[in-house]
Structures are given as C-alpha cells and as structure tokens.
Design a protein with these regions (language model features):
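Glycoside hydrolase catalytic-domain groove-lining segments
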Residues: 61, 65-68, 200, 214-225, ...
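Acidic-and-aromatic substrate-binding clefts and catalytic sites of carbohydrate-active enzymes
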Residues: 50-51, 55-62, 87-90, 95-103, ...
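Substrate-binding cleft and catalytic face of glycoside hydrolase catalytic domains
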Residues: 70-225, 230
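Bacterial N-terminal signal peptides
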Residues: 8-16
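Aromatic-rich peripheral "rim/lid" segments of glycoside hydrolase catalytic domains that contact
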Residues: 26, 30, 272, 276-279, ...
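Active-site beta-loop-alpha junctions enriched in small/polar residues
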Residues: 44-47, 84-86, 124-128, 176-181, ...
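N-terminal carbohydrate-binding accessory modules
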Residues: 22-76
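Conserved, mostly hydrophobic/aromatic
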Residues: 42, 71, 122, 174, ...
Length: 399
C-alpha cells in the first residue's frame, strides 16, 4: 500500500489535477461480437449515502445530473446493490460504507428500476462487509444453532424478496452471499478448518436461502441465482469450491467472479478460469466486481487501495485512458468466453467519491468487523467521477 498523503496535500492535489482529468479525451476500441443483452453493469451501493453527505454529480458539460440517469445514458444497463441486515450498533450509530440496510437498498432499487435498468441484489447475510477474510453473522443471529441459522437465512431471504416484490422492484438476479470463498455465517457456514462437514453445512445454508427466495417466484427461473467468489484468476479455488457445491446439488444459474488485476493478476488468467468453469459446470459467468484507478492521487486522509504500486502491478496506466482500456479489455474477455457463457461485467462503485464525513467504516463499523483502520474512503480514485463529482470520459466505455 502506498504512503499516506496528508489531508491538505490530498485536497490540493484533487482540486488541482482531477478536474483536468474530467476534461481528458479517451479513445475506446470497439467491442467485438458483443451480444445485445450483454450486461454492462455497475455497483452503486454507496450512492445514497454519498448524496446525503453532500456530493453532487455533473455531466461532461458541467451540468448537475442524477448519476443513475447518467450511467444509463452512457450504456449501463444493470445495477448491483448490496444488502446488510442491520448496519448499526446497539445505540443506532451507522457502520458507514453506504449504510446499506433495507430502506437504503430499496430506495436505490426504485431509482434503478425507474431508470429502466435491471437489478442484481447482493445478499451479504451480515451486518457489514463480507469477503474471503470475514463473514460475521448478523448480531441478531449470533447465538443461533446451525439448524436455527438455516431457518433464519430462509425466512430473511423470503421476507426481503417479498418486500422488494411488494415495492415493485423484484430483482432480476440475486446473489446468495458475497465473496464466499470461505463460506458464510462463520463459523457454522465456514468452508474450511471446522473439523469436517464444512460444505455439507454451507450447502444447507445456501439451499435454505434459495428456498426462501423461490417462495416468492412464479417459477424457479424468474430470478437468476448467482454464487460469487473473489480472486477470479484462481482456477484451483473455483474448482475446489464449485466441485463441492455442485456435488451437493445447490441450484444456481451464474458464477460471479471478482477481478482486480492489481491484486489478482492479468485478465488472461481470468479468461482461462472463466473458460474452464463455464464448461465444467455448464454455467454462465459474470465478472461481478472490478475497478481500476484513473489516478494514483488521493482526495482524503485514508490510504487508497490503488496507488503507484497497484498501477505498476495492474497492467494499465493510472490514467483515465488506462481505466477505460481496463474496462474495455475486461468486457471483451467475458464476451469471448466459449458458447456465449460470458454474460457481463459490473464495475464496482463508480460513484463512490469523498464528501466530508464519508468513510468505508465508522468506529462502530470497525468494531463490528474487528478491523480498525483510518477513517475515510480508500476507493475514490477508482470511481468514474472525479472527487468534485465531474464525470470522467472513461464512462463512455459502456456505450
């Protein structure tokens, strides 16, 4: 990770350099053989919180716009939204990172559907961030037995989807867990290191959640089901996990992959993995998380996850053109998966910029996940808007 940039210097950098970046032009190589229904998606889960904290967004003419409408105008056709169970502590203090409780996620879902885009709902089954290194149970489920957890995840999924359906925003696709390499609802649903039977228990939880989802559907295929792993270049991980899950008959339609070249390696390795797993399991594949920095500069006091080191490792320059090239090449790799199994790409958090008070986690949130780090946004230089909310030309890669 790169050295911290002091806050005053970071602000001066953002005020000086980043508006110029919004005026840069980019050259985008056309996609080959892109299907008309190819998913050009974005995860905008932090948007409502960012707006509540004072951020506004501008188009290329510096006209204030609704960023959802601007994404749609530039070709984005599918939106991913995460959902946490109760992202607040006992005193009601929010955890940050978007504050993605049911009310927040429903409000965003209504904007998505009103704009004419499709919706992917990402169940984390936790009160805050989940990934391969952490899968904390919701506070309300902390003392439940395994059998009780199966009931809880079934009922929660059923009731949540029923609410979305009632509000007229039934998702088009649902993700059962987020980056579940290590399983979910630890320790009962952990996929390793629990003395045996790990995948039996994990499959039981997944099946319970899927059954809850399907209670709201007119047919099993009405809403696509995705299972999602991180580290999209690691074929051995995907084979290990999905071999075990398919042995146990867990029903799903799509394999989701996270892909950050600066952590995971080149797109060519992702492509090889997608080619293999799409045929091995006879499933569609979607890159459901991906992002790249348009600058190594920083806009706040939190060290960014993308800096000079990541730019050197990521395979593309840390420029607006480099960002656009990354997204274009990633989409092409998915399109090129054999037998038309590659269905799309979701860009992660293109609208996550840095209004005052914005943070990946508050102190309350850090306490919940037991991860204490500097307050602030570590991702703003991978957005598709600069830190003043001006859209970057790289957004045109979705057209």
């Amino acid at each position: 990770m790169k050295k911290m940039i002091p806050a005053l210097l970071a602000v001066s950098l953002s005020l000086g350099a980043m508006p110029l970046m919004a005026a840069e032009s980019v050259v985008i190589k056309p996609l080959r053989n892109a299907p008309s229904d190819f998913i050009k998606g974005a995860d905008i889960s932090t948007l409502l919180e960012v707006e509540r904290q004072g951020s506004v967004f501008y188009d290329e003419n510096h006209v204030r716009v609704d960023p959802v409408a601007l994404l749609k105008k530039n070709g984005v056709n599918y939106i991913r939204l995460r959902l946490w169970v109760d992202p607040h502590d006992a005193a009601g203090r929010p955890y940050g990172g978007g504050d993605n409780d049911l009310a927040t996620t429903l409000a965003l879902a209504k904007r998505v559907k009103a704009a004419g885009m499709k919706l992917l709902l990402d169940f984390h089954y936790s009160d805050f961030w989940t990934d391969p290194g952490k899968q904390f149970k919701p506070k309300a489920w902390a003392n439940l037995s395994y059998d009780q957890l199966k009931i809880a995840i079934h009922d929660y999924t059923r009731d949540t989807i029923a609410r979305f359906k009632k509000e007229g925003v039934l998702p088009d696709m649902v993700q059962i867990g987020n980056e579940t390499n290590g399983g979910m609802l630890w320790p009962e649903g952990k996929s390793w290191g629990q003395g045996g039977g790990e995948f039996d228990r994990l499959a039981g939880l997944l099946n319970a959640a899927i059954a809850g989802l399907r209670e709201n559907l007119s047919s099993p295929g009405q809403v696509k089901i995705m299972l999602h792993l991180a580290e999209g270049t690691k074929n051995d991980t995907f084979r290990w996990w999905f071999d075990e899950i398919t042995k146990r008959g867990v029903p799903f339609d799509v394999i989701g992959l996270s892909m950050y070249t600066y952590w995971d390696g080149p797109i060519s390795k992702l492509k090889a993995n997608m080619d293999d797993i799409s045929q091995r399991y006879n499933k569609d594949v979607i890159v459901v998380e991906a992002a790249y920095g348009y600058t190594p500069a920083n806009c706040d006091n939190a060290e960014n996850s993308f800096g000079e080191k990541e730019a050197a490792a990521g395979g593309y320059p840390a420029t607006v053109q480099g960002q656009a090239d990354f997204v274009r090449d990633l989409m092409q790799s998915v399109i090129d998966v054999p037998k038309k199994r590659g269905k799309g790409v979701f860009y992660w958090e293109p609208t996550w910029i840095t209004p005052p008070g914005n943070t990946w986690a508050t102190e309350a949130g850090m306490n919940y996940i037991n991860d204490h780090w500097k307050l602030g946004n570590a991702r703003e230089n991978q957005a598709l808007f600069n830190c003043q909310g001006e859209v970057l030309p790289s957004i045109k890669v979705f057209k």
